[in-house]
């Protein structure tokens, strides 16, 4: 295999398949690569449909709900949502921007005063958030699908001593948990 960078879109037709190993989002260069690979008839992970579906947490929540897939209770939050309504989820509560990935734009409020502060910060950047009760876990799953079929599942473990798979230091650095699979 060959590693290609974000400026190598023109060379994509020279390859047999594309396995994206960077952040995926509709407004990211990875999406253009994915669309181009699909239009060339190449196998691609992550395919454009998966990026659209999985990069928006609110869309994904509604899709799972519609298909009866079990998940944590959740609430879609806007500036008009009374904070008291969010308290019904209990504390700690996790707030997620719709388009964050790899632990970015996911924050945890331990108590009501934290919730008020985080809501103000996050709603200044996004009109909607997804709120869920915090449920401790040792890992998240990443599922790979190719042409509608399960290809792989791997565990993304939480960063050591942290509640997310990635811990950011606020200076552009981060550390991650180990990956299995």
Positions of PLM-derived features:
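Short glycine-enriched loop/turn motifs at secondary-structure junctions
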Residues: 69-70, 99-103, 179-180
């Amino acid at each position: 295999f060959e590693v290609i960078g974000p400026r190598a879109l023109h060379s994509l037709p020279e390859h047999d398949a594309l396995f994206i190993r960077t952040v995926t989002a509709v407004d990211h260069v990875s999406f253009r690569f994915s669309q181009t690979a699909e239009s060339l008839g190449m196998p691609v992970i992550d395919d454009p449909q998966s990026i659209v579906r999985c990069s928006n947490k609110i869309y994904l929540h509604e899709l799972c709900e519609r298909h009866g897939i079990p998940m944590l209770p959740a609430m879609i939050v806007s500036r008009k949502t009374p904070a008291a309504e969010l308290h019904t989820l209990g504390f700690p509560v996790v707030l997620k921007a719709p388009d964050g990935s790899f632990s970015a734009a996911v924050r945890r409020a331990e108590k009501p005063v934290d919730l008020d502060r985080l809501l103000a910060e996050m709603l200044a950047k996004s009109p909607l958030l997804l709120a869920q009760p915090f449920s401790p876990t040792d890992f998240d799953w990443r599922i790979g699908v190719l042409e509608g079929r399960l290809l792989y599942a791997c565990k993304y473990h939480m960063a050591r001593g942290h509640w997310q798979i990635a811990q950011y230091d606020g200076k552009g650095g981060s550390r991650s948990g180990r990956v299995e699979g």
